[in-house]
UniProtKB/Swiss-Prot annotation:
Assembly: Homooctamer; tetramer of dimers.
Family matches, as InterPro entries: Aldolase_TIM, PyrdxlP_synth_PdxJ, Pyridoxine-5'_phos_synth
GO BP terms, alphabetized: pyridoxine biosynthetic process
Lineage: Bacteria, Pseudomonadati, Pseudomonadota, Betaproteobacteria, Rhodocyclales
Record-level Gene Ontology MF annotations: pyridoxine 5'-phosphate synthase activity
Catalytic site positions: H43, E70, H198
Major location (coarse): cytoplasm
UniProt similarity note: Belongs to the PNP synthase family.
Annotated protein name in UniProt: Pyridoxine 5'-phosphate synthase
Cellular localization per UniProt: Cytoplasm
Species per Swiss-Prot/TrEMBL record: Azoarcus sp. (strain BH72)
Length: 249
């Protein structure tokens, strides 16, 4: 059955706006779990703009569902991951001037370095995921470096969906869906796990959730935005219902 990993970074964004102690991302993780989340995702950025080191430690200690740590492939982050031991570490590109992750990781240009990073994480018992664009060359490279999971960047699909007035049958949207579908087939052919995420929301999630072979979606901003009005538990539960409805056909 398809799973939902809830990204709670923007709960921390709200807290950091006042440099105070609330809202607490750990409590958001608990509420997300109660709403049906299968995992919690946080991005410990090098500039610590939202999630802090202590947040990750507390989440590791207190949450009862799997923890996915998004991270740059740096020595500092590898050391933190090896110490905290999340169930999964997702390698992402990172730029200090970006508002959010703007594209997939370019594995092809840095295979040797990323292979070493994955080996160091695996040595600590951590499954490694890579966040990549829906490109066959990147998927093949992910398999070569030993990634266990590929998360396909759904931003281009989400942007097309919005630009086309939420028309899931428009040629532009169908082209993006087909690109992700073909990427998923390639991922599965390598024996890797097919995940997806980025800019998914309550309007565009179902065409992605019904793709063959897809295992998990990571969604954050849309859920936190909805939770401002409806509460995290209800927001997560509604997203999970939409995904399951789509996956069931």
């Amino acid at each position: 059955m398809i799973e939902l990993g809830v990204n709670i970074d923007h709960v921390a964004t709200l807290r950091q706006a006042r440099r105070t102690w609330e809202p607490d991302p750990t409590w958001a993780a608990v509420e997300a779990h109660l709403g049906g989340a299968d995992g919690i995702t946080v991005h410990l950025r090098e500039d610590r703009r939202h999630i802090q080191d202590d947040d990750v430690r507390r989440l590791r200690e207190l949450t009862q569902i799997k923890l996915n740590l998004e991270m740059a492939a740096t020595d500092e982050m590898v050391g933190i991951a090896r110490s905290i031991k999340p169930e999964m570490a997702m390698l992402v590109p990172e730029g200090r001037h970006e508002v959010t992750t703007e594209g997939g990781l370019d594995i092809v240009s840095q295979e040797a370095r990323l292979k070493d990073v994955i080996a160091r994480l695996a040595d600590a018992g951590i499954v490694t995921s890579v966040f990549i664009d829906a490109e066959i060359a990147q998927i093949d490279a992910a398999a070569r470096i030993g990634a266990r999971v590929c998360e396909i960047h759904t931003g281009p699909y989400a942007h097309a969906f919005h630009a086309q007035g939420r028309d899931a049958e428009s040629p532009a949207v169908l082209a993006e869906i087909d690109k992700i579908r073909r990427a998923g087939e390639a991922i599965c052919s390598h024996g890797m796990r097919f995940n997806a995420g980025h800019a998914l929301n309550y309007y565009n999630v179902q065409p992605i959730a019904r793709l063959p072979g897809i295992r998990e979606l990571h969604i954050g901003h849309a859920i936190v935005s909805r939770a401002v009005f409806s509460g995290i538990r209800e927001a997560v539960a509604e997203m999970k219902r939409l995904m399951r409805e789509a996956a069931a056909g």
